[in-house]
Every structure is written in structure tokens, then in C-alpha cells.
């Protein structure tokens, strides 16, 4: 797979598309490019691309791997796609990036973070810092540092949310939190 080949574009959906939107677009495109309905010689290749795109984007884990691959592709010009992305092997994405993005994705999903909160976390937990740690102290220690930073940061998100939802309850939580930090 080439870095310039984008499954989201092939299926004509945004990278935030729901499974339902992906399936709807897939069905529409399959009808349009199916070799039995479309006699254009290029339709067969387009049909195959649509099939493989849907196979990846309709499976949560394959999609997560693919999203990590896209990010790595756009952030790293030396990223070797052939060695780092295989949709059939869940953990064969560039391991450094996969660990980082998997941890971040899990955090974003678990706490249902909005875009602003996600960006704040990505700014704090910088990928270059993470990769430097991997190179200097190893992946296990780098993951431990990343997870410890996340554990330290999560209560701040919680307090911010509670404070925003209820000013009285937020004050009480902030007061108690001041004793444990």
C-alpha cells in the first residue's frame, strides 16, 4: 500500500465517518463499480480497491491500525509502508507509533474527550518525546512514563468537566483533589 492511497477517499467518506456511513458509501460504490454492472476495464480495479477499503474500515481494530498508519505516513517521510502496515496482523504497525496512538485512542474513547481535550493531551504527550524515550530507555520504560503522565493528567480532565457542569460540586472536588496532589 502506498502512502498516497487513502481508504477513506476511496470510499468517499470522512475519516470521522461512522460504520453506518462507511457501509452506505460502500454499498453505493459496489453497485456502481461491480464488474457485472460496469463494463469499463478500470472498474474491476476500482471495485477491488473499494472491497479492500471496506474490509479495513469496517473492522474497528483494522481501522485503528490503519489510522495509525495514516498518521505515521503523514508525519514520517521515511516510513516504510511495506514493513509497517499489514491489516491482517493487528500489531505489525510501526510499534513505536502504534503503542503511542493505541494508548491515546484508548484514552480518548474511554473518557469521551472532545477535540479540544484531545489536542491538549496530544500537546502534553508529544510523540517526539515518546520516540526519543524509546530510543534512549526502551519501549517498556517509555510506555511506563507515558502511562504515568496520563494517570497524573486524567484527574485534571475529570475536575475540569465536573467544575464546568456544576460549580458547587466542582469546588468540592477541587478542594479534595488539592489534598491528594
Swiss-Prot record:
SMART domains to which the protein is assigned, alphabetical: DnaJ
Signal sequence coordinates: none
Organism superkingdom: Viruses
The J domain, residue ranges: 6-70
Gene3D superfamilies to which the protein is assigned, alphabetical: DnaJ domain (1.10.287.110)
One Pfam family in the UniProt entry: DnaJ
CDD domains: DnaJ
InterPro entries: Apopto_cytoskel_mod (IPR051938), DnaJ_domain (IPR001623), DnaJ_domain_CS (IPR018253), J_dom_sf (IPR036869)
Coiled coil (UniProt feature): none
Keyword vocabulary terms for this entry: Chaperone
Protein name as it appears in the record: Putative J domain-containing protein R266
Amino acid at each position: 500500500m502506498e502512502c498516497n492511497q487513502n481508504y477513506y477517499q476511496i470510499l468517499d467518506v470522512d475519516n470521522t465517518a461512522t460504520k453506518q456511513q462507511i457501509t452506505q458509501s460502500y454499498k453505493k460504490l459496489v453497485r456502481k463499480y461491480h464488474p457485472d454492472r460496469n463494463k469499463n476495464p478500470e472498474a474491476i480495479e476500482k471495485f477491488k480497491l473499494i472491497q479492500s477499503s471496506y474490509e479495513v474500515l469496517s473492522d474497528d481494530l483494522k481501522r485503528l491500525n490503519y489510522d495509525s498508519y495514516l498518521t505515521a505516513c503523514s508525519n514520517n517521510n521515511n516510513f516504510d509502508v511495506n514493513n509497517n502496515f499489514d491489516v491482517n496482523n493487528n500489531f505489525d504497525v510501526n510499534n513505536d507509533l502504534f503503542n503511542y496512538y493505541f494508548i491515546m485512542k484508548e484514552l480518548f474513547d474511554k473518557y469521551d474527550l472532545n477535540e479540544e481535550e484531545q489536542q491538549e493531551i496530544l500537546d502534553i504527550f508529544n510523540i517526539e518525546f515518546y520516540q526519543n524515550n524509546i530510543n534512549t530507555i526502551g519501549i517498556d520504560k517509555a510506555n511506563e512514563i507515558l502511562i504515568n503522565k496520563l494517570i497524573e493528567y486524567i484527574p485534571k480532565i475529570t475536575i475540569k468537566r465536573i467544575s464546568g457542569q456544576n460549580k458547587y460540586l466542582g469546588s468540592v472536588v477541587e478542594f479534595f483533589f488539592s489534598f491528594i496532589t
